[in-house]
Each structure stands twice: as C-alpha cells, then as structure tokens.
C-alpha cells in the first residue's frame, strides 16, 4: 500500500484554504491540445510518495483507468482507492519540461501535488529559503523560486473556461495560503566585507550555510560502513589469473610492542566489520609502518604486503584522471571546497568469492577483508570508477581524484548551490566523508599535493620538508630513487630538473655498483640548498595568450610555459610551468638546429593540454626554427625526421618569434639555475 497523506473532500473545504506559510509552492504550467496554457501553483510534498492532480486541471480525455487501483492512507487514518491516472504528462517549471510518468487523480484541495517520486526522478532535490532546485535529466540544476502566496484554480467550470475560443468566464482563484510573506529590504552595513547587504539576503545566506552544515552532517561519519548512512552501492570483484594457485607468503616476526598495537587495531577492524576471521588458503603478512604521517597522528598504520597477490591477480585498467587535466578545470575559479572520503576503499564491498584473496596473517591470527583493502593494485581504479559514476554529471564544478573531491565556483552564490548538490549526491549514494578533513568555502586550498591560491599554485609545504629531511649521504639505490621521485613530483616547479638529476640518476644504472662519495654528498647539499622554496606559478586563464620558450644544449632540453596577463592596459608575462629532459643517445648526435626543434616539440608535448586548440607563440633564439616550419621538404629519405616533425607541428596553431641569444633571458635563467647547483 502506498502511503500518502491527503485531506478528504470535507476536510478540504474546512482546512485546505489555509496552508502553512512554510509550505513549498512553485509555479507550474500544463499544455493540452485545444486548451490555453494552464498555470498552477504546485505543492512540493516530499512526504507524499505520488504525484497527485485535481480532475479540474487536467482534461477528462487524458485520464485513464489505472491498471491496478491503489490504496492510499489519508490524514484521518482511513484509506481510499485511487483508480484514475494520467500517463506521461509534461509539467513546465521555470521554462524546463519535466516529464512525469504517472499522475494520480484525487481531490486534495490543491491543484497539483509534486510527490517524492518526482523529487527522486529529478534528484538531487535541494531546498533553500527562497528557492528549490531540481536537476534536469541529472545534468544541470534548475532554480525555481518559491511562491510567497498560493492559490487554487481547479474548480468546477475551470477547464471549460480554458478551452481555446471559450467565452466562459474563468472562476476566481481560491487563496490557499495564510498571507503573502513580506520581508522589507532594509539594508545593513557589513563592515568586514566593505559592502552593504539586505537583511533578507543576509538571512538567506545564513540559512543556506545552515543547510550545507546539515547536509555535511548527514554524510560524515568515523565509520566508513556506518549502517545509518551507507547504501553499500559500491561493489568490487577480484580474480586470480590462475584460480588453481594458492598465494602464500610466510608470516613475519613481531616485537612485543607491535603485538600490542596489532591487538588494538585488529579489534577496531573487527568492530567496524571491515575484516573477519578467515579459512582462506591464501596468506599475506601484515606489518606496521610509522612514517611522518603516522607520527603526526600518533598511531602506527597496519599495512598488508600484497606484492605476491598483486602479481597473481587480473588488473583493472580503468584510468585515474590526469592531474594536469583536473587543474585545467579550475582555471579562473575563485572559491573552493574539498572533501575526503572516509577510509575510501573500505566503502567498497568485496563479493564473497573475492574476500579469501585478501587474507592476511598477524599475531592475532588469519583474517580476510569484507571490503577493498589498501595495497591491492586494483583498489584506486575500482574506487575511481565508482566516484566517476556518481559525480560525472557535475564535471563543470567538481573533480574527483580517487577519494579526494574538489568543488570549485566563480562566486559564493554558485558555490553554495554546487556544494549542496555534491553533498546531496553523497547522501543519495551513501558516500561517507571525513568531517575533520572537509574544507568549506576557501579561497586558498590544498588539492593533489598542491596549494591553490588566487590563480596560482605550488607544491604543499610537506614536499620541501621531505626533500630537506633526506640525509646528505644516501645509503642505497632505493633511498636515491625515493629522493629523485620527490624531485620528479615537483618537476613543473624546478627549471632544468633533467640536468640537476643527471649525476644522481647515473648511479641507478644496473651495471653500476652502488658507491656514494664525498663529492656526491656535496652535490646533494647544493641541490637541497637551491630548493628552499617553490615559486607560486600562474594558472593560465582560457582567454590569456600563451607563450612557450625553449632552449637546447648538447645533452638537455628545457621549456617554459608563460601567459600574458593584461592588467589596466599593461601586459605582464607570468610563468605557468617548467619542463626539461635529456636527449636520447641517438638524439645527442643531431645537429644543433634539430635539437632546438626537438626542444620545441618536447615542450609542446609537455604542455599540450594548455596548447590545444588555442593559438600560441613559440619564442626561440634559434634562427633555423622559424624557416624550418615553412620549408617544403620533398620526400628525401634523409630528411624523413624533419618531414615527420613538420607534420606533427601542423596540428598546432602558433606563431614563431625569434629573439637574439643575448635577449634569451630564459636560456640565461636556466643556465644560471643549473650553475648554482654545480658551482
């Protein structure tokens, strides 16, 4: 039995002419062949499971007998039968067509009741003080102003009066609201903002912020499987390449202190129901790590060594987003909010067949995961797929990288709506967020390891901390690889990085025995000394003209992306990115002109996401490149490389500006930066 609170016809006359002033009424419009447009005040009732309309607002020929009459409960506790329905009716709201599959006929004293089935069909449904919002076709929001006064037009004779060429006078509308709600626009000074706001606008803003807090509270928990909030819609499966194999790795030895810590953590995991005792033939050892992050939070982290299992299972090829692509989405945005999924992977349930593959050993015994554990190679792709499925429709103002969600907007007004829509979607899917990691309405925010601030970006402070904490004397190749990995992570912010890395990179060759000399220690000290801070780089806006400047030497190439910012008639060139690399062995034998051309090509490849499909400027001190672009090669096999390069460059739109070597400040800058390290 569908549950729907309605008034009886008798009650309608007695009660429904007065409604609660906080009721939600919006304007709606119906069109029927042979009739004038029918404008209605629709009541949005999320407590009603169905859409209900009066027989006096929809022509009789559009009503049909229901295949199965339904029973509904009304306000006095009794039940009535509804047997008439209207199929696939189009309700026009705020100029948008909303198709309703089924509308039921019942006299409630209101012309049209929009029930919860409509709200779910066009979710997320968001209510603010002055408006409601539906998402049309789940792709863009439709703002609908609330009415401060509502009337009923559907009475005897109304439809006759609405027929085209009808001379019947339309009946007088019946008021169904207590009174018109009026809020005088008395302005008050907001000194901290340096501007003036009306009391009404201030009240509305406060109400919206309160709504955001309420929505955030609904989706936050310390338990990633909170039974009151999760919908358990994210599921995953893992398969062995050879199902007949048992993957076993021998257990580890544990100190008394570690045994005590394991005892606490295993109990916590059992209480959360993310693990359970296992009889699996598979086995991987668990161990504890206590790195900087763990020391900051005061708790060691349990890790399972799934290296053998990862080799034995089928991978997931779903791509993680390209970080540069994500950053292009936020160009020019002024206000940000970010959210972190609580223990993200643990929100994905494993099917029963996959759970034994996650079995691990620890001092307390043999356990397996009910959820996707950290350490499985498939975990990031599995989680990204689910998050993309949930948030793809909001790509214009939201991006997701695994378990990090960033919302970005041009102004606070838009941002209130955008954040509300994202939190509503989390609530709908049961995606649980960490409240302590939520950052709301920030002009400066951390995302993807970057500090984003007023159109600039740079690596977060902990990147420099990691670099400086490395010892000057490294113990082995693994430690050197970690150090070079951090430098590579920050490569966009370090000019001529390839040259800086080269002496250290040479030590990682397989045929070179490990040896760390006093000279290596001095070089390491100089590298760290010259990386005391990363410059904030400009995030180019779509309308700004872009420039690439390049340089090549015998062994290396370098490039820089710049943007021309126009401010009060003055052009300023701002640095956006650096790029560098080493020439391959064969390329080192190229003529210097070809190396300069290759430097241009490599730089364009590095910054292609910004250079497609815009028109940009290439600036170089190489006189050959400008003529090379316009040369007409005639298929000489010796010039095949040049023909290929010309064809590749033809896909881009650019001008070439030659500058004198003495004016090439970029090349001077690169040389100066490199010489600092080598001096």
UniProtKB/Swiss-Prot annotation:
PROSITE patterns: RT_POL
GO biological process, one term: proteolysis
Enzyme Commission identifier(s): 3.4.23.-, 2.7.7.49
InterPro entries tied to this protein: DNA/RNA_pol_sf, Pept_A3A, Peptidase_aspartic_dom_sf, Rev_trsase/Diguanyl_cyclase, RT_dom, RT_RNaseH, Viral_Replic_Matur_Polypro
Entry keyword annotation includes Nuclease: yes
Domain of life according to the entry: Viruses
Keyword Transcription carried by entry: no
Domain Reverse transcriptase: from-to ranges: 272-452
Coiled coil: none
The entry's keywords: Aspartyl protease, Endonuclease, Hydrolase, Nuclease, Nucleotidyltransferase, Protease, RNA-directed DNA polymerase, Transferase
Annotated catalysed reactions: DNA(n) + a 2'-deoxyribonucleoside 5'-triphosphate = DNA(n+1) + diphosphate
TM segment ranges: none
Active site residues according to the UniProt entry: 45
Chain intervals for the UniProt region annotation (Protease): 40-130
GO molecular function, one term: RNA-directed DNA polymerase activity
Domain notes: The polymerase/reverse transcriptase (RT) and ribonuclease H (RH) domains are structured in five subdomains: finger, palm, thumb, connection and RNase H. Within the palm subdomain, the 'primer grip' region is thought to be involved in the positioning of the primer terminus for accommodating the incoming nucleotide. The RH domain stabilizes the association of RT with primer-template.
Family, similarity comment: Belongs to the caulimoviridae enzymatic polyprotein family.
Functional description taken from the UniProt entry: Encodes for at least two polypeptides: protease (PR) and reverse transcriptase (RT). The protease processes the polyprotein in cis. Reverse transcriptase is multifunctional enzyme that converts the viral RNA genome into dsDNA in viral cytoplasmic capsids. This enzyme displays a DNA polymerase activity that can copy either DNA or RNA templates, and a ribonuclease H (RNase H) activity that cleaves the RNA strand of RNA-DNA heteroduplexes in a partially processive 3'- to 5'-endonucleasic mode.
Name of the featured protein: Enzymatic polyprotein
Source organism of the structure: Cauliflower mosaic virus (strain Strasbourg) (CaMV)
């Amino acid at each position: 039995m569908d549950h729907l609170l309605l008034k009886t016809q008798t009650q309608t006359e007695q009660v429904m002419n007065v409604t609660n002033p906080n009721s939600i009424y919006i304007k709606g419009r119906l069109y029927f062949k042979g009739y004038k447009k029918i404008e209605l005040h629709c009541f949005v009732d999320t407590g009603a499971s169905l859409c209900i309309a009066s027989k006096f607002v929809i022509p009789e020929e559009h009503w049909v007998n229901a295949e199965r009459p339904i029973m509904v409960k009304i306000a006095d506790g009794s039940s009535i039968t509804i047997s008439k329905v209207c199929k696939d009716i189009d309700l026009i709201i705020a100029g948008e067509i909303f198709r309703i599959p089924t509308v039921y006929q019942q006299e409630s004293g209101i012309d049209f009741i929009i029930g919860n089935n409509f709200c779910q069909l066009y979710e997320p449904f968001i209510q603010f003080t002055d408006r409601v919002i539906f998402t049309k076709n789940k792709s863009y929001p439709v703002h609908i102003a609330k009415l401060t006064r509502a009337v009923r037009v559907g009475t005897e004779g109304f439809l006759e009066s609405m027929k085209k060429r009808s001379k019947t006078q339309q009946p007088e509308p019946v008021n169904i609201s207590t009174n018109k709600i009026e809020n005088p626009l008395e302005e008050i000074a907001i000194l901290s903002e340096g501007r003036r706001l009306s009391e009404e606008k201030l009240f509305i803003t406060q109400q919206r912020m309160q709504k955001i807090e309420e929505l955030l509270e609904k989706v936050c928990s310390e338990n990633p499987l909170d039974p009151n909030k999760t919908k358990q819609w994210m599921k995953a499966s893992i398969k062995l390449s050879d199902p007949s194999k048992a993957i076993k790795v021998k257990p580890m030895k544990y100190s008394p202190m570690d045994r005590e810590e394991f005892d606490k953590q295993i109990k916590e995991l059992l209480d959360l129901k993310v693990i359970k005792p296992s009889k699996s033939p598979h086995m991987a050892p668990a161990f504890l790590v206590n790195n900087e992050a763990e020391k900051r939070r005061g708790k060691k982290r349990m890790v399972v060594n799934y290296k053998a299992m990862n080799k034995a299972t089928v991978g997931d090829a779903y791509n993680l987003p390209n970080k540069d692509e994500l950053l292009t989405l936020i160009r020019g945005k002024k206000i940000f909010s970010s959210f972190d999924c609580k223990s993200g992977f643990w929100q994905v349930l494993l099917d029963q067949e996959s759970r034994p593959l996650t079995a691990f050993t620890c001092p307390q015994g043999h356990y397996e995961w009910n959820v996707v554990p950290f350490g499985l190679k498939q975990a990031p792709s599995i989680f990204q797929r689910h998050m993309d499925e949930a948030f793809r429709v909001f790509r214009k103002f939201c991006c997701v990288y695994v378990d990090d969600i960033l919302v970005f907007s041009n102004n606070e007004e838009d941002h209130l709506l955008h954040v509300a829509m994202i939190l509503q979607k989390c609530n709908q899917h049961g995606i649980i967020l960490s409240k302590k990691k939520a950052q709301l309405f920030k002009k400066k925010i951390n995302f993807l390891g970057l500090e984003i601030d007023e159109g600039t970006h740079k690596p977060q402070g902990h990147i420099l901390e990691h670099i400086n904490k490395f010892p000057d004397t490294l113990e082995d190749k693994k430690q050197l690889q970690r150090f070079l990995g951090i430098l590579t992570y920050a490569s966009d912010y370090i000019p001529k990085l390839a040259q800086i890395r080269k002496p250290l990179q040479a030590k990682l060759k397989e045929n070179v025995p490990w040896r760390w000399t006093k000279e290596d220690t001095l070089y390491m000290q100089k590298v760290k000394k010259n990386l005391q801070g990363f410059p904030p780089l400009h995030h180019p806006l779509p309308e700004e003209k872009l420039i690439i400047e390049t340089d090549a030497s015998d062994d290396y190439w370098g490039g820089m992306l710049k943007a021309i910012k126009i401010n009060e008639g003055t052009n300023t060139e701002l640095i956006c990115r650096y790029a560098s690399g080493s020439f391959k062995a064969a390329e080192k034998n190229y003529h210097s002109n070809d190396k300069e051309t290759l430097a241009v090509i490599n730089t364009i490849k590095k910054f292609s996401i910004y250079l497609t499909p815009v028109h940009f400027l290439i600036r170089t001190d190489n006189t050959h490149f400008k003529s090379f672009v316009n040369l007409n090669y005639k298929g000489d096999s010796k010039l095949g490389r040049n023909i290929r390069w010309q064809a590749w460059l033809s896909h881009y739109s650019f001008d070439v500006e030659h500058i004198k070597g003495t004016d090439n400040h970029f090349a001077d800058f690169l040389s100066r930066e490199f010489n600092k390290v080598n001096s």
